[in-house]
């Protein structure tokens, strides 16, 4: 796992929790899907500065939509 500062780690944890609630999947399963698809380290972590300014609903919609675009979820 890449080294993440505390703020980014808390943000990633928040994102995983919100997406897991939306998709009715366990947080562990969401983490695996985000990690394995590259969304976690190629999108969420590098885009932290912008993404953390979004509302939780918009952020969750954005991540779920991106997961759908990449075929991670249907």
Predicted regions and their residues:
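A generic structural signal for ordered alpha-helices
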Residues: 1, 8-12, 37, 41, ...
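Membrane-proximal intrinsically disordered regions of secretory-pathway and membrane-system proteins
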Residues: 1-4, 72-74
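A short, structure-level motif marking secondary-structure boundaries and short turns
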Residues: 1-2, 15-16, 57-59
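N-terminal acidic leader/helix
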Residues: 4-29
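Short polybasic/polar patches that bind polyanions
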Residues: 21, 35, 68
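Amphipathic alpha-helical interaction segments
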Residues: 23-26, 41, 70, 74
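Amphipathic, hydrophobic secondary-structure cores in small proteins
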Residues: 26-53
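Long, compositionally biased
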Residues: 48-74
């Amino acid at each position: 796992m890449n080294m993440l500062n505390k703020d980014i780690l808390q943000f990633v944890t928040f994102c995983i929790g919100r997406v897991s609630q939306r998709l009715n999947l366990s947080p562990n399963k969401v983490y695996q899907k985000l990690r394995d698809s590259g969304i976690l380290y190629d999108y969420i972590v590098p885009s932290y500065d912008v993404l953390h300014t979004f509302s939780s609903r918009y952020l969750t919609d954005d991540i779920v939509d991106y997961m759908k675009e990449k075929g991670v979820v249907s």
